[in-house]
Every structure is written in structure tokens, then in C-alpha cells.
Amino acid sequence: MDDKISPAGVSGARDTEKQQVENVEYSGYDMTSSPPPPANASLAAVAEAHGIQLPTIDPARRVAVEKSLKRKLDARCSIFILIYIMNYLDRNNLASARLKGLQEDLKLDDTQYATCLSILYVGYILMQVPSNMFINRISRPSLYIAGAMLLWGIISTLSGNAQGFGSMVAIRFLLGFIEAAFLPGALLILSKWYTRRELTKRNALLFCGNLISNAFSALVGAGVLSNMNGVLGHAAWRWLFWIEGAATCTIAIISAFVLPDLPHNTRGFTEEERQVAQLRIIEDVGELDSDANQGPLDGLKMALKDVKIYVMMFTFTAYVVGLSFNAFFVRIALGTSYSASN
């Protein structure tokens, strides 16, 4: 008979009925040295087999601690929205820069300009999966995302120094390569802290960053392009890259101190809050990881065999294709009765 989890231990934890298929780490413990537990073992029994002591806390006290935990966590994770805004600003400012002479100054024909737009996604595709495989193996994902943001901010700034097609293509490829670390990494960090029911709302708020960026990127671009032309002898489109890139670097430095890491090692939380954070996710999953002895390539193989992955790929491809007009929207608007200033 399965062991029961006492009220002083894990309240309401469910008996496991299947083996865990994703690699989730808690409290930095290593389960690779122990054999996988039987599929019908209780959560407490699995924890005991691996030498893990589940935290104990009074139910009434837990409610108060959990409320404080989520309040702090929501405040710190809200910076993800700002990072997502800058992520989209830095990849889409090429369309705004085209208004003030980028294409003419760099002597790009229409095909070369379109190549500069598209090459970003080549780097993005190449790096997304390896980046998330890597971030899942490190203990300080906040520094990884902040470091990636700092790098893409520097690369975006260098776009203002491009002198021709070759340099712009190289910069745009590197920009996509580094930017690829953000979105899947952000979703991974959120999944380490929030339960499945809570994730729905947080993921929706995260994607608001995309919408906000689309709403205000043209206004930001218009402000810079209208007032910075000729300042210090440089074209306005160069200032657009320099200003937005500098803003990205500033936010990256701030995010290194604000973003959370993992429940067991994040600064700014009490020990009690960290214990509750770990306990919440263990209870939500309903079981401990029995596949921790598998490497990242095993997880990749499992994902490639999952038909739901391909359904999501098709859906997201249709979504991105539908939004691709953003890269040419400014030019389309100029084909109407609107002027560049409008």
C-alpha cells in the first residue's frame, strides 16, 4: 500500500500513476544516483528514497506565506513584459529606420532589404532549442537571460554603425541568434514557480509585451526619427538603433538583479517562502522526477515524437505569417495618402 503524506508534510499530494517525463529540479538535489522509483510509489515514498525531506508547515501559516510569495514573485516577474517589449522593438526597428534613409545610405535594393529582415529568423530558429536545453541545466537562469539581453542590446546598437549589406546581414543574424534565448527561457522560469492553473494568466500577461511593442514602436520610432536627424552629424536612423539599443542594455542590467532564479536558490525570498515555492510545484506535478538520469537529448527525442509539438508548430507558423506584414507596414502606409510624419 502506498505511504500516506501526513498533514504535517505535504497536504493533498497525489499518488503518482505515471513516470515523470520532464526534467524538473528542486532544492538542487541529485536523483541520478538512485534508481527510478516504481510508478505506483507515493510522493512521500519517492522523496524518502532519494533522501529528500519535504518541508513541513502549518496550513494556516502556509496560506500567509504563499500569498506573500506570489506577491513578490509577480512583482519581480513583471519585468519579463518590459524585456519582451524591447525584444520586439530591437528586431522590428529596421522597418522604421527605412523611412529616414537606411536603405539609401546602405545602398540596399529591395531584395537585400528583405534579406536583412528575414535573416534574423534564421539565427532565431537555430538557437531556440539549444538555448532552452542549456538554460534548463544551469542554476542561475536570471543571469543567462539578462546576459543575453545585454548582448542583443549591444548588437542592436551596432546596427547603427552598419556601412553596407554585408555588415547589416551579419548584425541581424547575430541579433536573432541571441534574442532566441529570451521567450522560451522566460516561459521556463515561469514554469518553475507557478502552478499550471496560475501559468495561464502569467503567460497571457507576458505576451502582452508583444502587443504593447507593436502599439508603441511606431511612436517611439517617429519621435527619434523626427528630432535626431543630423545630430552630431549622424542620420536619424542611426540614432534610432543607438537609443533603443542603449535602453535595452540598461534594462538588461536591471533585470539581472530583479529576475528570479529557481525556487531553492533565489535571493530576496525568506527560507520559508522558498520551501513553500518548492512544495507548491511538487504538489502541482503530483510526483517527483523519475527521468532525471536522462540527458537533454533524451528530452529532445521525446519532444520530437510528440504529435502535439507539430500541431503547435503549424499553428504558430500560421500566426507568425499573419503578422509578417509588420515588417512592411510602414512602407505600405506610405503607399496610401499618409506622409512619413503621419
Walk through the language-model features, giving the residues of each.
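Central mid-sequence intracellular linker of multi-pass
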Residues: 2, 196-210, 219, 225, ...
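Cytosolic juxtamembrane N-terminal segment immediately preceding the first transmembrane helix
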Residues: 2-94, 104, 301
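Extracytoplasmic
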Residues: 75-110, 126-127, 131, 217-221, ...
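Short hydrophobic/small-residue motifs within alpha-helical transmembrane segments
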Residues: 84, 121-125, 211-213
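Extracytoplasmic gate region of multi-pass secondary transporters
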Residues: 95-96, 295-342
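Conserved MFS/SLC helix-loop-helix module at the cytosolic interface between two early adjacent transmembrane helices
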Residues: 125-168
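Short hydrophobic/alpha-helical segments at membrane-entry points of transmembrane helices
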Residues: 144-145, 164-172, 184, 235-236, ...
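Hydrophobic core of transmembrane alpha-helices in multi-pass small-molecule transporters
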Residues: 155-156, 167-181, 189
